[in-house]
Regions:
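Conserved donor-nucleotide/metal-binding helix-loop-beta segment in metal-dependent transferases, i.e.
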Residues: 100-126
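Short, acidic, metal-binding catalytic loop of nucleotide-sugar glycosyltransferases
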Residues: 20-29
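Acidic donor-binding segment of Leloir-type glycosyltransferases
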Residues: 28-55
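Catalytic core and acceptor-binding pocket of nucleotide-sugar-dependent glycosyltransferases
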Residues: 150-261
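Short aromatic/hydrophobic "clamp" motif used to bind/position activated sugar donors
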Residues: 87
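N-proximal low-complexity "stem/linker" segments adjacent to membrane-targeting elements
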Residues: 1-8
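Conserved small/polar residues in nucleotide/adenosyl-binding loops
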Residues: 301-307
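Active-site-proximal specificity loops/subdomain of glycosyltransferases
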Residues: 50-80, 84
């Protein structure tokens, strides 16, 4: 029987996280990271023993600590000793559009597929995208209490880096070689062997870690680079050609990307129903309640009928 490990990051809205866990609680276990900047008590009260909480990291968007909490979650899954068939990475503001039976059946039918998008950034001709790795992006993980001063420092350093002739190579050191860097969404669903491979590389490839510590949003780069330079590469979802954008690189989620991710409301229901996606984001308690109540999870039979 298939069993899924859901690894989830959250920093607010404990009631919705409890709702998400309840919706997916079928042949599944939940491993949760709560940002150290947040109060964990509402999450403990809302979830109790329904989830496994992992050691916490202080998260700054776009910083290396986002990869560290993913590593923490993978460690908990692997050390559990449970032979999961799939490890699914979610945020605490996701919600399923499919029934649990449909999710399990779909993964069973695609048991060798690694649902992680990848685009070769090393070969990319769009300078703005290439700068994610060739420009240094320091200071994002500084544990400053003043977000205002921290953001000022980040912006100033970014402008300085654009002026100074200091660049990183568009290759990441991996297994003693210069590996192409791949970019994709940090929400994915990979097999347990692939998850183990990723975790081992995060533990042993010190030069790789050092390289990505100063990259822009390494959670969209590091694990993708490991997978697409691994024996699992042919099973991943590689996009070639022109830069496709993050929407196409997010295989299982419907997300309205923009300057910031848009909160979903009842008005988005028709689009979500037609998207064919397994999950949606961003769901917020209060604002999205009517949408969640209106979602009728897509059945496995419905999926097969529309293939």
């Amino acid at each position: 029987m298939s069993r899924i490990a859901y690894i989830i990051s959250a920093y607010k809205d404990a009631p919705h996280l409890a709702r998400l866990v309840a919706a997916l609680d079928d042949r599944a276990d939940f491993y949760v990271h709560i940002d150290l900047n947040a109060d964990i008590h509402p999450f403990e009260e809302a979830l109790g023993d329904k989830v496994t909480f992992v050691p916490r990291h202080r998260i700054s968007w776009g910083g290396w600590e986002q990869v560290e909490y993913q590593k923490e979650l993978l460690a908990a899954v692997l050390h559990s000793g449970i032979p999961y068939t799939r490890v699914v990475c979610l945020s605490g503001q996701d919600y399923p559009l499919w029934s649990n039976n449909a999710i399990h059946r779909y993964f069973e039918e695609h048991q060798d597929t690694e649902f992680i998008g990848g685009f070769n950034l090393t070969r990319c001709t769009v300078k703005q995208q290439l700068h994610k790795i060739t420009h240094y992006h320091p200071f994002r993980d500084l544990p400053w209490k003043s977000i205002w001063w921290k953001n000022k420092l980040i912006v100033a350093s970014r402008k300085l880096v654009q002026i100074l002739p200091i660049r990183k190579a568009p290759f990441a050191p991996l297994e003693g070689k210069q590996a192409d860097v791949y970019f994709g969404s940090d929400y994915w669903a990979i097999t347990l062997p692939c998850a183990r491979y990723v975790y081992e590389k995060l533990c042993t490839e010190e030069k790789l870690v050092k390289y990505f510590r100063t990259s822009f949003v390494p959670s969209e780069l590091c694990i993708q680079t490991i997978v697409f330079n691994s024996p699992f590469a042919s099973k991943g979802l590689l996009l070639e050609g022109e830069y496709p954008g993050l929407t196409r690189l997010t295989p299982l989620h419907y997300i309205d990307y923009g300057a910031s991710i848009r909160v979903m409301t009842l008005e988005d229901l028709p689009v979500l129903q037609q998207s064919g996606k397994m999950f949606c984001r961003k769901i917020v308690s209060g604002t999205s309640d009517r949408l969640v109540e209106a979602i009728e999870p897509v059945s496995y039979t419905h999926l097969r009928a529309h293939e």
